[in-house]
Amino acid sequence: MRYDHSLWAHVCIGSVAMALFWGTFLSAKGSPLHRRIGRPFFLAMLATVLTVPPVVLLRPVPFDPGWIVSLVYLSACVGTVVTVAWTAIRWKDQPERFRGLHFRLLGPLVASLGAVVLVAGLVKGDPVAAVLSWVGLAYGTAMIYFARRRAPLHRQWWLAWHVNATLGLFTAVHGTLGFVVW
């Protein structure tokens, strides 16, 4: 695959994800339309994440390990947030399942990667990396805490996780676009 093809695939799938995001965002929450548009949005986000490796690895510039670290970190964060947003709704009546294996694996993963990105950002004097590290550090830590928490849950705990994750996806979609356009 050529770099330009991978880039166009990423742009096209990402554009579909952005359109689906806004369709979901503007629809009545919980309505059949919201669910009908929201499901393909999550799938489009996962597909967008899958198009990132070819874009990074086929770039016509010298190999840069920093880009690989960024790729792994951001892909793990987006994949985690998509999973949390989806499962919060699907498993809202099953809190133990929701905070089960995927929370116990993904929480420490994104928290650890966030720490790596923070250290790398501080060592390189890169404020963007240092700022982006908070996503993994904060979100991963919250996931670890929630997975271990055994106190009674708020009646709409699942909605808090869903909305929080969806706002994270808003940031991922629009932040990436802003970074590219800038």
Tell me the role of every PLM-derived stretch.
Residues M1-W182:
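Alpha-helical membrane insertion/targeting regions
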